[in-house]
Amino acid sequence: MIVVDTNVIASMWVPNDLDEWVYKVLKKDDDWVSPLLWRSEFRNVLSIYLRKDILEFSVVLQATEEAEQLMDANEFEVNSTQVMSFVLDSSCSAYDCEFVALADDLDVPLVTFDKKILREFPNIAIHPKEFAL
């Protein structure tokens, strides 16, 4: 089991050069979990691609459905005190700290491309390339 953040999830459905590593992560460990927040962040990511006419509406809807199926029953609530504790100890947003808190709570790695999270939480976060090797 691993915690994945929204950028990792989104990399499977939006145009990018990172999807190769995401699929390697999925092959190594397909038990992905995230805080419930991932859904809202994912919709926001897709909205950017939709508004810039990079993805069509039908593709966005399909991506949403597929991502929700992937993460079905793998979504967790997180403890606000724990999240705010990580906020206090870092310069990361509360959104980012939700993923950190979940990984810490489950005692599993957080797989992320986010450089700030990787830098500020090196004992919890790991880059997909590192995890996949």
Model regions and ranges:
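Short, well-structured N-terminal submotif of metal-dependent ribonuclease cores
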Residues: 1-37, 49-58, 116, 133
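Non-catalytic, surface-exposed connector residues within folded enzymatic/regulatory domains
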Residues: 36, 54-61, 77, 97, ...
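Active-site-proximal, substrate-binding regions of enzyme catalytic domains
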Residues: 43-72, 80, 86
